[in-house]
Amino acid sequence: MANVKLFDQTGKEVSSVELNDAIFGIEPNESVVFDVVISQRASLRQGTHAVKNRSAVSGGGRKPWRQKGTGRARQGSIRSPQWRGGGVVFGPTPRSYGYKLPQKVRRLALKSVYSAKVAEDKFVAVEGLSFAAPKTAEFAKVLSALSIDTKVLVLVEEGNEFAALSARNLPNVTVATAATASVLDIVNADKLLVTKEAISTIEEVLA
């Protein structure tokens, strides 16, 4: 099993923590990670685009001129697609771009990105993140003590609201729970800051 250093909130190394190789030590599957990232990015699209077809455009209920005898081309409505101000043919309609991948694929992608962060030495384990009250300055001190000055994803245990509230005003800091962190969140972060309890949760979820 891989060992990573365990720090406290002051940046002092207190011990080490063993990571499950089946989750944090596999060979990253880049193809699977790519598929899951594309899927999750697609799910973020709003899909609210819409245009009016000839039935939705106002007006055009009356035939503009009689069928025969005018010398002009026959027309049934001034809202036909060939008319200025007419309806759009085959335009975009509201839709969901999201699609689901098999659970095994999603789990393999999570294991792959966690393993990649550990292998690249971008996985920082901390004993805990406890705050008496939501204080942005206190959270900034923790990051400074741990020498984290890049885009970071902080993974905490469920119910640690003060950590999330303390970090929400800090640029380049995202807080998520260990059970809900997505592959896209992890890929977008330069470093992971993970509490000891969150590591246990990750191993329970992905075991």
Curated annotation (Swiss-Prot):
Name this protein carries in UniProt: Large ribosomal subunit protein uL4
Superkingdom, taxonomy of origin: Bacteria
GO biological process: response to antibiotic; translation
UniProt-annotated stretches for the region Disordered: 49-78
GO molecular function, one term: structural constituent of ribosome
Keyword Ribonucleoprotein: yes
PANTHER family noted in UniProt: 50S RIBOSOMAL PROTEIN L4, LARGE RIBOSOMAL SUBUNIT PROTEIN UL4M
Family to which the UniProt record says this protein belongs: Belongs to the universal ribosomal protein uL4 family.
Subunit structure: Part of the 50S ribosomal subunit.
Disulphide bonds in the chain: none
Stated role: One of the primary rRNA binding proteins, this protein initially binds near the 5'-end of the 23S rRNA. It is important during the early stages of 50S assembly. It makes multiple contacts with different domains of the 23S rRNA in the assembled 50S subunit and ribosome. Forms part of the polypeptide exit tunnel.
Annotated GO CC locations: ribonucleoprotein complex; ribosome
UniProt gene name: rplD
InterPro entries: Ribosomal_uL4, Ribosomal_uL4-like, Ribosomal_uL4_dom_sf
Keyword Ribosomal protein recorded: yes
UniProt keyword list: Antibiotic resistance, Ribonucleoprotein, Ribosomal protein
